[in-house]
Amino acid sequence: KEIQAVLKGMKAKKPGVPKQLAYVEGELFEQYIHDMKIAQRFAELNRQAMMDTIVKGMGFHVEEQFTTIHNYIDVENMILRKGSVSAQAGERLLIPINMRDGSLLCTGKGNEDWNFSAPHGAGRLMSRSAAKEAFTVSEFKKQMEGIYTTSVGRSTLDECPMAYKGMDDIVNNIEPTVTIDAIIKPIYNFKAGEEE
């Protein structure tokens, strides 16, 4: 109720700028960053729990572990990363390509001109809705042959490999940001979707 009352009060105070240009400062900014830290920490622990479950269930041995996140606020350096990941000098990071082709295992170069960042993936060739209209589940299944997955279906069609740019598109454009150490090919792929 308290949150709803504050929101109602804030709606009554119409800002003099369009919503997309609105910002917070002072105490509201500090509260926002505080809450963002909590949400990002919760997400980190959630990812760790999922990884622990998969590692245990598959009987894997972890040789190296690190986290790469995108679309977040780097609160230590006050960098908003939308469509990018941290690529500080010497930092290990992962850049996903698609469900079929895997990910690039990289080391950051700490390029200040790139805001100490790298792209968070290959990028889409088309919107999610366009992908669902352009491709079929049978095409999707064929593309995923050789990779164990229970995630190929109509609800995940927007994530099919054909909806994304190819590996060469990103490899040829990220040299200023990272060194590519290896290409990791998936053996198991899971993507949550709507139940069918």
List each model region and its residues.
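Domain-length cofactor-binding catalytic modules of enzymes
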Residues: 1-196
